[in-house]
């Protein structure tokens, strides 16, 4: 049940997992997510789907090792089974009817941006992509983005690969060059999505952001993933994960997302130390 059939290290801290989940694979669409638990005592974490194969009955996710649960996941092997793998959750990304779009991805968020970009491309849109990473060693899926985009700009914070600078700078240049986008779709760190939205707002370009705040049950019951969008309370798990970036209360969203930062750091260190002791 929920067996890991393939595990592939894309980068030192970024890993691809292909999970046996036939029912989810049959229903999944770009933009949707799953909630997984590594073991009976583990926490539930939301991860947006990277790919799905109804014929094989598998769902692929790409995960960066940044917290306690992702550390546990990184120590699992092919053949191991997850305790829970629930989905598909959330509403699929709307891609039809667009003539020209720009997809902006940041870090491991590019794993989420890619299936959306491909769907825009398959639906006939001209697709531009701007993807950003901290450095060359963290660049992922570049070849996939090239295949499904008409224009690709790769940015790194330190200039070790592609263009040096932020994705917002590259996006603004594309807009100022006369590209008239029907929509900009952004997925990545919350701060990045905030400033992508602020970049496009003066131009009046509709901007969609994919939100992955703290979630527990994924059905709207716990209220942990609530956001303020256009002055109304929304739940990312059932109303999203896609929202109008110009209407999100970003200050509140960022504040809520950092509520458990100290606790998460403690659990991360505790989990890492546990695995170190087991290895000794």
Per-region residue spans from a language model:
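Local cysteine-cluster metal-coordination motifs and their immediate loop/turn environment
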Residues: 112, 190-191, 212-242, 270-275
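A generic structural signal for residues embedded in beta-strands
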Residues: 36, 83-85, 227
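Short, Lys/Arg- and Gly-enriched loop/turn segments at beta-strand edges
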Residues: 42-51, 89-99, 237
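Structural signal for conserved beta-strand scaffold positions within catalytic alpha/beta enzyme cores
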Residues: 6, 51, 154-156, 209, ...
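Short Fe-S-cluster ligation motifs
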Residues: 235-239, 243-280
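FNR/FR-type flavoprotein reductase catalytic core
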Residues: 68-216
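Ferredoxin-reductase
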Residues: 1-78
